Amino acid sequence: MTDLDAAALRTVGPGDAIPNDFVVPYYLDDRKLRISVARVADRLYAFDDLCTCGERACPLSGGLLTGTTIMCQCHGSRFDIATGAVINGPATDPLTVYAVQDVDGSVQIQA
């Protein structure tokens, strides 16, 4: 990934807290924004933690991660965490994805 605009970067935690094939949720803006960061094949992905499939706002960080696909534990919707695209419904709206990088051991998100 190219260097991101430093003015817009937010450090969310240490890079070593996210092992491969694992998802970690982070709360930003006084818990108003939930973003998950996943590491797959040593690459980081950042996306909205809350599923778009309904009013329950189910956390995707508790779902099943298989490669770059994550499945909502509540309704079974599946998303591509690299693009945010819906792979399988009932969700119809994509996830918001964020640029993310590991800089000197710190995970930084452009959000």
Model-predicted segments: where are they?
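N-terminal pre-ligand scaffold of iron-sulfur
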Residues: 1-67, 81, 97-111
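C-terminal structural segments of small proteins and small subunits
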Residues: 82-98
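Short beta-strand-alpha-helix junction that forms the catalytic/metal-binding core
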Residues: 70-72
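Glycine-rich His-Gly loop
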Residues: 49, 75-76
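Short Cys/His-rich metal-coordination motifs, predominantly Zn2+-binding knuckles/fingers
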Residues: 54, 74-75
